[in-house]
């Protein structure tokens, strides 16, 4: 593997080399040290594979994965790669099966990923076949450890990664439980192609500073302003975060007008204001919560719009974002209508998040030829801890703290 030439400058995580988003050798190392390393990769929802034989195909980084429930009701995950010649084992996005068979040479696997059958293993009429020394038990796709937390299914290639609860930490666990405290149903899906390196989008998710500056909808309709009550939680590793806020319609705030911020635009109006009409369902008054888990999982609650997002790298300058919109299984008909309508707020063409799908590409294009220069990530200081305010980049610095540890690029004393 070619060695990365990334050079970090300074004694903090406030300077990030632009080359980190364009260096192909570094991207190759990410696959081994992060996605196949000591992390928990989000794979799917437990409710997406409710019965024996139900499966989904997904990815851990670039590695294709099969996730399936067996007759023992346990969930198993293994590489979607035939042990014979490397073809995909499962071609469908989802389905139900008693077993898997590769279409190329008909090698078969059970629902736990064990190789169970080799076509013409003994040959034909005494000719050919596999050698007597061939042992099916010694061949098969690599298997992942599986952990389920609040209906979220995670997988890891590492035997050394902590339990999912310890990996997340108590504050992140509590905030996931806050949203996923009862059974959910999938009510919609999108897959979005992003014209940028995966890290640019994950920074964006963690960046509470940008939200009311980039997104006109957030600011104009006062769904999210930095002046609102809220805060940022960063776990001890730095890799996981929560940003949250509460709408206060009675609070007068002219700070955006005073600074002539573009995103505060009184001429921007809705023909159908019912889009903003919802219902109270969380006793803490939090109207927006964005939660991320390293390296690529997001859980959102924006008003009554609940969704999970899975971020996957596809090349050095492109990534894929899978959106899965959720409702609670006990939603009333009216509540479900509200969730479906508010799905227009957040998504590839959402009134709020459409800009996020573009701005990463603006950065990817803007840093061409600047690999030896640095991004400045100093809003709110140089620490990576939790914050009572959201005019900060603390959780972005936390991401780089975790990233550098996994990549072996920590700051030198």
From Swiss-Prot:
Catalytic activity entry: terephthalate + NADH + O2 + H(+) = (3S,4R)-3,4-dihydroxycyclohexa-1,5-diene-1,4-dicarboxylate + NAD(+)
UniProt binding sites for [2Fe-2S] cluster: 82, 84, 102, 105
CC cofactor note: Binds 1 [2Fe-2S] cluster per subunit.
MF terms in GO: 2 iron, 2 sulfur cluster binding; iron ion binding; terephthalate 1,2-dioxygenase activity
Consequences of knocking out this gene: Not affected by disruption of tphA2I, however the tphA2I/tphA2II double mutant no longer grows on TPA.
pH dependence: Optimum pH is 7. About 20% of maximum TPADO activity is observed at pH 9, whereas no activity is observed at pH 5.
Chain ranges of the Rieske domain: 41-144
Keyword Zinc tagged: no
EC number(s) stated in the UniProt entry for this protein: 1.14.12.15
Record has Hydrolase as a keyword: no
Temperature remarks: Optimum temperature is 30 degrees Celsius. Approximately 60% of maximum TPADO activity is observed at 15 degrees Celsius, and activity is completely lost at 50 degrees Celsius.
Keywords: 2Fe-2S, Dioxygenase, Iron, Iron-sulfur, Metal-binding, NAD, Oxidoreductase
InterPro entries per record: AhdA1c-like_alpha_C, Rieske_2Fe-2S, Rieske_2Fe-2S_sf, Ring-hydroxy_dOase_2Fe2S_BS, Ring_hydroxy_dOase_asu_C_dom, Rng_hydr_dOase-A
Domain of life: Bacteria
SUPFAM superfamilies for the chain: Bet v1-like (SSF55961), ISP domain (SSF50022)
Names of required cofactors: Fe cation; [2Fe-2S] cluster
One annotated GO biological process: phthalate metabolic process
Pfam families per record: Rieske, Ring_hydroxyl_A
Means of activity regulation: Inhibited by EDTA.
PANTHER family per the UniProt record, alphabetical: CHOLINE MONOOXYGENASE, CHLOROPLASTIC
Function of the molecule: Component of the terephthalate 1,2-dioxygenase multicomponent enzyme system which catalyzes the dioxygenation of terephthalate (TER/TPA) to 1,2-dihydroxy-3,5-cyclohexadiene-1,4-dicarboxylic acid (DCD). It can also use 2,5-dicarboxypyridine (PDC) and 1,4-napthalenedicarboxylic acid (NDC) as substrates, and preferentially uses NADPH which is the physiological electron donor.
Subunit structure: Heterotetramer composed of 2 alpha (TphA2I and TphA2II) and 2 beta (TphA3I and TphA3II) subunits. Part of a multicomponent enzyme system composed of a reductase (TphA1I or TphA1II) and a two-subunit oxygenase component (TphA2I or TphA2II and TphA3I or TphA3II).
Protein family according to the UniProt entry: Belongs to the bacterial ring-hydroxylating dioxygenase alpha subunit family.
Name this protein carries in UniProt: Terephthalate 1,2-dioxygenase, terminal oxygenase component subunit alpha 1
Source organism: Comamonas sp
Gene field: tphA2I
